[in-house]
């Protein structure tokens, strides 16, 4: 590991807005039994009727989990705080729940040095909890808010395990407690029951805090009615890897599951987790980047069949930390399993959105799923997409059902001034050299010039606006003069004030057959490499050009080996999901 320091991404809270209208009293009913509730509605949403000053605070409760992640012979307990409205004795309230590894802050820990050689496969060629805006907004509207510290963090027991079953079960235990299936205790050891709750729980959060709802939903736990994952991970492999390549979350070069766990390891006596960290280091297999059992246990997409809660996905189309593949594959899997769902895709980066009446929409969603209020939220089109001009577009599904995969043979612009050469011409061969120290924004500039470290392919000038919705893919046939390299494809919008990298994708050529196994690459031998870029929903304006830039290493994301590897490209094509 290098001496560099890292700061892991933090979660965000949500703003609050109140809209006036008429009022009414309602009662919500669970299948098993009737629960008395007392709320009032305005515009189909709960309105604030409970005093925040009189709210009941249950601080420093400890919920007993099913796991012993620190292997001390005792079940881990997770620390939570509860804020709920002061109600009549027989009135029950549902719960909005956020679990987080970040509440007690982050430690500065070393990250991996990425300025190093790639590994060649040897084989025969073939902080204090603040209930904040959740509590301020929802408690007066008849909700309890629970904020927890995940295993190994803050006042909780155990060790952080970066997304595996132990972390999932530790988070799930709070829902079990709310429904009478787990025990919780005060600091003095007195048992506490959640007899004030209807048992209906909605989980939410941003980033890691939004990832845990995805994970817990795959357990099918009873009582979890809905989740709102914002900028959330659905598969940890795709957070730290891509098609066999070791890939960094945007802005956090050198981060991986082990130093992530070290950064959030804020419990007392953190040294007891030393063995757990070592197991993370071994399991993540940073050397090959292959998908293995370690990553499979942290893949929630494959377990979408177990999800019983509804899901409201929120993600930024320009999120290069938790990249867009995370929402796209999760959304697809949920649809395949008929999970009730809704999605907002905004133009921001890593985080949520406050535009498009977000707070009111979230309020209605929670009211529908936790109080059973018929407010029309499920009658809306499933997907809202924010366009580049900040307006919002409603569509039936995502990718847009009108998107058609279109195979395109591009035009090479930087090898011939007078005669564009078809990328698909069998008798044409083009080469470029890897230099990992040159950043991608430099490599996409001036597409008309010949640059040794890239190939630029451009389409003719667009005669009309052209929208993509889905996952671009690229396929190239060619060879490498070494047994190891990176491969990177950049989809670029040419024609504005400066080139804009719309999306990108990476591959380890040694994973030419699968992400599970590396294949030894024979220098000079032709292979066909096919890989995906990150999904997107983007409009190329009329008068612009769509470009594909091929490079080897990507400074901000890949391992950065020594310069000089030569890549030769012969036949290639790109497939774009173009909306007709």
Curated annotation (Swiss-Prot):
The active site is at 207 (charge relay system), 319 (charge relay system), 350 (charge relay system). SUPFAM superfamilies: alpha/beta-Hydrolases (SSF53474), Galactose-binding domain-like (SSF49785). It comes from the Bacteria. Gene3D superfamilies: alpha/beta hydrolase (3.40.50.1820), Galactose-binding domain-like (2.60.120.260). Its EC number is 3.4.14.11. It catalyses: Hydrolyzes Xaa-Pro-|- bonds to release unblocked, N-terminal dipeptides from substrates including Ala-Pro-|-p-nitroanilide and (sequentially) Tyr-Pro-|-Phe-Pro-|-Gly-Pro-|-Ile. Pfam families: Peptidase_S15, PepX_C. One of its GO terms (molecular function) is aminopeptidase activity. Keywords: Aminopeptidase, Hydrolase, Protease, Serine protease. GO terms for biological process: proteolysis. Belongs to the peptidase S15 family. This is Putative Xaa-Pro dipeptidyl-peptidase.
